[in-house]
Amino acid sequence: MAKPVNVNQSKWTVPVLLKECEIYCPSTCVAFGPILSDNDSKLIIAHGGHRGVNMKLKVFQQLEQLSESSLADMPTALVHFINDLSSIPSIAVAAGPSLLIYKNLKPFYKFTVPSSAINPTESEAWKAVVNKKINGDTLLTVLKRLEDDVAFSKLTPISQTYLRADKETQVVLVEHYGTKIANSATITCIAKLTKSTAEPLDILVIGTEHCEIFLIDSQAFTILETIKIGSVPVNICAYGTYDVDYRLFVQTRASLIFCMKRGEADYQPIVISQSMITSMVLVNKMIVYTTVENLIHFASFRGKKMNTVKCPSKIKMLEPFIYPLKQLAAVIAVFDKEIRMYNEHYLLDTVQYEKPLAWVKYGCYGREDSTLVVAFKDGSIAIQIFRRKANFDTKLDYNQVPQAHALKLQIPKKTKVFIDLTQREVQLGNRIHKVYQKNLFDVKYRLAASYLELTSSASATVSTTTVLPVEISVDIHGFGPTFRMTIHLLSSSKQNLYDMHLSIISDPELYDFDTPLIPVHLLASGQSYSFTTLLYCKDPEKAANCDVRALLVHAKRATPIVTAVIKMPFSEFPLD
Amino acid sequence: MSGESVIEFTGFIKACRLFRENRLAEAEAVCTNLLRKNPLDQATWALKMQCLSDSTYVDELENEDMGLAETFLDQNVIAPNARPGTSFARPKTSAKGVNPILRPTTNAGRPLSGVVRPQSSFKSGSMDQAVRTARTAKTARAVSSTSARNMRLGTASMAAGADGEFVNLARLNIDKYAADPQVNRQLFEYVFYYLNDIRVAHQIAGTASKAAGFEDYYWKNQLAKCYLRLGMLQDATKQLQSSLEQKKLIETFALLSKAYNRVDQPMAALKTYSAGLEVFPENVTMLTGMARVQEALGEYDESVKLYKRVLDAESNNIEAIACVATTYYYGGKPELAMRYYRRILQMGVSSPELFLNIGLCCMAAQQFDFALSSILRAQSTMTDDVAADVWYNIGQILVDIGDLVSAARSFRIALSHDPDHSESLVNLGILKHREGKIDEARSLYSSATSKNPYMFEGNYNLGLVSFTQGKYHECRELIEKALAAFPEHEHCKKILNHLKPLYESI
């Protein structure tokens, strides 16, 4: 079913489908990692289900589902992390404003993002409505006024829902949530950061709708640091260790990428993209991000753009690919029915699928270091393994430009003579100009004189008058002493031309003509006419040749209309 | 002052001294007088023959004139479908990126060389084409099987025979004289160069070679020359190779290479030249020959390198200077080309072509004061055979200046001098096209292509006009012809790509 099209050259094994599974979730809700005591890396997926129904945390082992447990809220992201060196790792699922921590696949802890300050008017209004001092409609008007005053996004989630809900829901909302109104922001993204290389514990990094980023100690779930930025974070990539030096790359909804270093307080965006950034990953000390213009950008950690790939279609997401055994690193770009692997210079691989893709996840699954989990739009999931013998020896230039464009213009180097001549131009510019003008006049004068001679003698093959534009050309066939002369006439005048003659002239000592005067009764415009005559070389032994002229004449014109001058070839001796 | 008497030479001694001083006519007159007194004086007879043959001596190495029959009815070519680069007929593919727009081509579809030589007008294409186009007007090319030079040589004997022919070949006892080592060389040269009777010359050489016991390299070379003239190239090669085994001479190497070139074996010719270079290091004849072959194969870099070596050995070699200059000019360094042409001028050559080239170089190097004056000089000294080219170039310069009316006029004048000047026809067509006179432009382009079917510009422009007029079939044929001349041309390929779906949709 989901076979790649060209199996033989593929760097990946044939994909194998997971049994009986139908998964719908964003790519953020997927993780690999050991969660049970057997230390085998599992595939963990927070399945979104349908409209808040059937939300499950599913774990897969090999090709089968191992377990599943229900989720209370819609998951937005999932991360697998280590919070205790002595026991097994945990899973954190971000749902709404909370992090649900699972240990040994059992609910373990719930961490909720601290509430921000609530607008006083808003909280008073809610209090009033709960205490029945005002009714629902008044609340709505108050909230609407507030929306105009402070902005929709500054209100609490419950007020936001209230503003957008219908009458019945509003009543339910007041009944259920009116008493405990809080302003804890929804978690948008989650990432993990190792504490230090000696102590491989993870620090959780979460971004919220309130433009805040929290660094959370995963053991005690205390907030280590809070960072406020100017835009809503949607994706975080962490690099380094928390205790030594770390960098957080935060992609925001405003298409900015911020870089946060340890010990720095002022954050300026390092990448400001004109078009919307859709995905961002870190590969090989490079930030790789895509925009809606189907471009993949490779940028340094300082935000300097190193290279850009132009892709043929929309890029769904990026996934980092690292194969430490061969020190291979690349980025996997997911398209509708194919994935492509790029590094900062080349297109390395393309794998095609028969079904549209949803997301891919690369990592360690089971005991296999480099597994690619491919999820399709229809909910099925397939597993591929990077072949141990595969390498990236065949490289293709992406941005393949036509060769003519890639060629550099060969601009000759400036020679010393050239510089000397330029110097001369600077010094004697005035005189050069004068001489040039005089010579130009001379050239034009001589040209005019020659042209006058030409028009008065009409010895041209193309007529010079605009009244009678006729063209003549002559072919001579044969080796001699008998030649055949063919004269072609072509008139391009608007009217037909009548009553002309073709006259053929040469030295009578040398040549004899069959018909020295050929009548031309009609020359229709645009038609080619040909006339033929034989000519004999009288004495080939003399080995002389001379010009033969063919003139087109009209009785009422003093000069010929057109003339063809033919240099005759030497005649062969007659065959006897 | 009595004892000083002027020594007056008389008789045979006088003739000898005159001959030594290269006063051939006087020496011949003295000999004629002596022979009247004693017709059997062999020494005088031989000297007279020497005088006569020296007066019409042609360097056989440079005598490359080939008639129409030899060019096209050639059964000597060994491989009809040679690999690219090993034949003069297929140099295109190995011509490394030679762009016909940057370096214009001759009528035969070859890029221009620095000098005109008979070899450079090797014609590719069919005989039919040659018969039709070559003879419609003034071309330097000999069209019939008898070439112009041989014709002139043949007639020389008739003119000389005012009081009877000097040596009547029909009555001469060839076997006797040819075997006589005292006179046979003179007799051979007389017959070969003066009388131009190759068959008899061959007979003499054959007899002499036999008499010398097939040991004399001189006679082998002479036999080879006869064979070359007669078109018996295999025999010529055999003689020359045998001659090389006896004695290594520059002439022999050069003649052998020439024979190889005639059978379209440029690689063998190059090998022979390099073998010659081993014996005669930095020999100009060998180097020039190699350079010419490389140029004909389209290896311009190699060719120019060799010409530069020629210049190292002989700094006043005009052919080498001109070829290097041409390469510089088309390589975008007109100011250097100008220096080279100026050097030719300093060496005392002053032809209209040279002034024209200097003018064009000056124009390209922005030395406007000299540009136009040189061209004016070329125009005032031009002969009829270069008039068309001169006017064509004046037209080009006027186009550069921006005076299109005058440019069109000068192209017309060029056409009156040479109705076959296809470049002028094309450029005139372009000017008409600009004015919007499409039909006139069309007819000009089509006459240009009929006169020079290998021309890239004509085919391409006519193709473009056909394309805009919707005559797609015609357009495709023309564009394909243009692509044959310039396989890399991007616009041609684009047009073909445009046409392809139209054909497929039918």
Swiss-Prot record, chain A:
Tissue distribution: Expressed in ciliated cells including amphid and both inner and outer labial neurons of the head and in both phasmid neurons PHA and PHB in the tail at larval stages L1 and L2.
Report keywords, A-Z.
Cell projection, Cilium, Cilium biogenesis/degradation, Cytoplasm, Cytoskeleton, Protein transport, Transport
Keyword Cytoplasm found: yes
Cellular component annotations (GO), alphabetically ordered: axoneme; BBSome; centrosome; ciliary basal body; cilium; neuron projection
Where does it live in the cell? Cell projection, Cilium; Cytoplasm, Cytoskeleton, Cilium basal body; Cytoplasm, Cytoskeleton, Cilium axoneme
Chief location bin: other
Q: What does changing residue 207 to D do? A: In ju598; impaired movement of intraflagellar transport proteins along the ciliary axoneme and accumulation of intraflagellar protein-B at the ciliary tip. Accumulation of all BBSome proteins around the ciliary base
List the GO molecular function terms. patched binding; smoothened binding
At the top level, the lineage of the source is Eukaryota
GO BP annotation list: cilium assembly; intraciliary retrograde transport; non-motile cilium assembly; protein localization to cilium; protein transport
Classification via InterPro entries: BBS1, BBS1_N, GAE_BBS1
Q: What happens when the gene is disrupted?
A: Mutants have normal body morphology, but with reduced body length and width, delayed larval development and decreased roaming movements. Defective cilia structure and function.
Q: What does this protein do?
A: Component of the BBSome complex. The BBSome complex is thought to function as a coat complex required for sorting of specific membrane proteins to the primary cilia. The BBSome complex is required for ciliogenesis but is dispensable for centriolar satellite function. Required for proper BBSome complex assembly and its ciliary localization. Required for cilia biogenesis and both the assembly and movement of intraflagellar transport proteins along the ciliary axoneme.
- Share what the entry says about its subunit structure, partners included: Part of BBSome complex, that contains at least bbs-1, bbs-2, bbs-4, bbs-5, osm-12, bbs-8/ttc-8 and bbs-9. Interacts with bbs-7 and bbs-9.
Identification of the protein by name: BBSome complex member BBS1
UniProt organism field: Caenorhabditis elegans
Q: Which gene encodes it?
A: bbs-1
Swiss-Prot record, chain B:
* Major localization listed first in the record, in broad terms: other
Which SMART domains does the record match to this protein? TPR
List the PROSITE patterns.
TPR, TPR_REGION
Question: TPR repeat positions in this chain?
Answer: 217-250, 251-283, 284-317, 319-351, 353-385, 388-421, 423-455, 456-489
Question: What is the annotated localization of this protein?
Answer: Cell projection, Cilium; Cytoplasm, Cytoskeleton, Cilium basal body; Cytoplasm, Cytoskeleton, Cilium axoneme
Entry's CDD domains? TTC8_N
Region Disordered: what ranges? Answer: 83-112
- SUPFAM superfamilies on file: TPR-like
**Record's GO cellular component terms:** BBSome; ciliary basal body; ciliary base; cilium; cytoplasm; dendrite terminus; neuron projection; non-motile cilium
Expression across tissues is: Expressed in head and tail neurons. Expressed in ciliated male tail-neurons. Expressed in thermosensory and CO(2) sensory AFD neurons.
BP term (GO), one: protein localization to microvillus membrane
Presence of the UniProt keyword Protein transport in the record: yes
Q: Null-mutant phenotype, please?
A: Mutants have normal body morphology, but with reduced body length and width, delayed larval development and decreased roaming movements. May exhibit defective chemotaxis tendencies. Defective sensory cilia structure and function. This is characterized by increased accumulation and mislocalization of intraflagellar transport proteins and impaired movement of intraflagellar transport proteins such as rab-28 along the ciliary axoneme. Disrupted assembly of the BBSome complex at the base of the cilia.
Keyword tags: Cell projection, Cilium, Cilium biogenesis/degradation, Cytoplasm, Cytoskeleton, Protein transport, Repeat, TPR repeat, Transport
Pfam families recorded for this chain? TPR_16, TPR_8
Q: Where are the transmembrane segments?
A: none
Q: Tell me how this protein assembles.
A: Part of BBSome complex, that contains at least bbs-1, bbs-2, bbs-4, bbs-5, osm-12, bbs-8/ttc-8 and bbs-9.
UniProt function note: Component of the BBSome complex. The BBSome complex is thought to function as a coat complex required for sorting of specific membrane proteins to the primary cilia. The BBSome complex is required for ciliogenesis but is dispensable for centriolar satellite function. Required for proper BBSome complex assembly and its ciliary localization. Required for cilia biogenesis and both the assembly and movement of intraflagellar transport proteins along the ciliary axoneme.
Name the UniProt record assigns to this protein: Tetratricopeptide repeat protein 8
What's the gene? bbs-8
